[in-house]
Regions:
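Alpha-helical recognition/docking segments in bacterial nutrient-uptake
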Residues: 1-125, 190
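Short, solvent-exposed amphipathic alpha-helices that sit
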Residues: 19-33, 119-123, 146-165, 180, ...
């Protein structure tokens, strides 16, 4: 605490990413309203390569002054240095500071999870039920990554529920990135195996795939339906706008502040909280867009 203002240390990577920026902005708004201030500690990389440069980056977390910090919030999704985040939680515990892990569940702190499975199920079910599609391809995230494998499991479960065959020839790992998604599209077109719909595990891959299909002469959604997942702002600027699913940043931020306030008031918060993902239906699946097209492509 500094004066009468309580301090929240926020730890993450890539604060400049659109999703991270939006959650930090929402969190700051709720924090200020409740007499908190944010001290944001972040790295420019995701600490994946374990280089000397990244080792230097992660030292930013050593700057956390637990003598003035009242609570710690970690955003661990996309951070490829579990030991770094573990050390933050352990250090905070030594000072008796509550820790809230957002996106990743831990036994040693309070966890706020996102309803990814339910949200992703809404997207897939919408394509099957509302549009009657039974020929569906899938561009997943990273192989063996928890969230990616969960979305694959949801996809396969729904195919089985509706007695739709799983097409292994149009199943790809896209690594949550545009380049592998482009390669997947090229493979489908060149081998003449384009399905009626492509479900993508995130918006970035869906936007890239849609653009490549259009470049190759396909119309969306007339020739192929494309859906994403994340609820990114970019989903509203592609043509057509992308059907996706995302969380409310305000709901996430409010949950974080409410949990911190309970912990600091001496109450015992729940160990796990869940923030739901909601379906956002636009015209990449063939539905009427919720708002007038922002970018018509004309």
């Amino acid at each position: 605490m500094i004066g009468n203002i309580k301090i929240i240390a926020v730890c993450m990577c890539k604060v400049y990413d659109e999703r991270n920026y939006r959650i930090i902005r929402a969190l700051n708004n709720f924090a200020v309203e409740n007499d908190y201030r944010l001290f944001v500690y972040h790295t420019c990389s995701d600490l994946y390569w374990k280089t000397l440069s990244e080792k230097g980056e992660q030292s930013v977390f050593d700057l956390i002054d637990y003598n003035i910090t009242d609570a710690v919030v970690t955003f661990e999704e996309g951070v490829y240095a579990e030991n770094v985040m573990t050390k933050i939680r352990m250090d905070a515990a030594q000072y008796g500071k509550p820790v809230i892990s957002v996106g990743v569940e831990h036994d040693d702190c309070i966890s706020i999870k996102f309803g990814y499975a339910k949200g992703f199920e809404q997207v897939v079910r919408h394509v099957i039920e509302q549009h009657g599609v039974r020929d569906i391809g899938f561009i997943a995230g990273r192989k063996d990554e928890e969230n990616s494998e969960e979305r694959i499991a949801v996809f396969r479960k729904l195919l089985e529920e509706y007695d739709i065959p799983f097409r292994n020839d149009v199943f790809y790992y896209g690594d949550y990135w545009s380049v592998p998604a482009l390669k997947a599209v090229d493979d489908m077109i060149e081998k003449n195996k384009v399905p009626r719909a492509i479900i993508c595990a995130n918006d970035m891959m869906a936007i890239a795939a849609g653009a490549e299909f259009q470049r190759r002469g396909y119309k969306i959604p007339e020739d192929i339906i494309i859906t994403g997942f994340d609820g990114s702002e970019e989903a509203n600027f592609c043509t057509p706008m992308l059907t996706t699913s995302g969380c409310s940043y305000d709901d996430t931020a409010k949950t974080i502040i409410d949990v911190i306030s309970k912990a600091l008031a001496g109450e015992k918060p729940e160990k796990i909280y869940t923030v739901d993902y909601d379906l956002s239906v636009e015209n990449s699946c063939g539905c009427k867009p919720s708002v007038e097209q922002i970018n018509t492509g004309e």
